[in-house]
Amino acid sequence: MTDWHLKEDDVVVLQALDDMPEHLFRVREVYDDCITGYALTGPLKGVYGEPGLELILRVHSRSNGGDQGRG
């Protein structure tokens, strides 16, 4: 598993799952096995979630404007 070094307000890309397409997700809190936050795109836009870290495909943007697209 990748150590993403995620922080609050980072935006990640979550993989497609079942009927849910790949989408952007804003991180609020980071735990050992999941993140919390809100979907920014897709059918669940604005909805709170707690996706597992294994669902992260890549980092879309960093809250501090650094290293975009790298995990």
Task: Please place each PLM-identified region on the residue numbering.
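Short coil-to-beta transition motif at edge beta-strands of beta-rich domains
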Residues: 3-18
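Intrinsically disordered, low-complexity, charged/polar segments
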Residues: 39-71
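Short linear motifs in intrinsically disordered
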Residues: 1-5, 26-29
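Ser/Thr- (and often Asn-) enriched beta-sheet segments in non-cytosolic proteins
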Residues: 10-13, 26-28, 36, 54-58
